């Protein structure tokens, strides 16, 4: 009888321990993501409809590319997406997002890339971008972090 009581107490204790372990287990966030102070330097990119037809950009169909964003640290892979865009008019913002979804504008590895095809379709003006930066368990929105300025002709060089 004493043996059965000890066995029952042992089983109850073991069950309580298992239930305690299961109840205390919860999903732990993987890694980290730090974006405080994240910025582009310079924080804008000039994009042109008409480029010099003899330039390397024209002959090799090279896109317009920003400098890589600085100040982002986190567990790899760290991913970047266009979160939103503000423009002078709603239709310009919609066109920008459409070109992004078509892959003619991209945010890759902290670089903003505008193809020549996209640059010819965008209307003149300023496009202020907000980016989503994320990894497995973390994300941040970098609001109004970069500006693309679209004009007809290349800026004159000194």
Locate each region found by the language model.
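Non-catalytic macromolecular-recognition regions in eukaryotic signaling proteins
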Residues: 26-158
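Bacterial Sec-dependent N-terminal signal peptides
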Residues: 1-8, 16-42
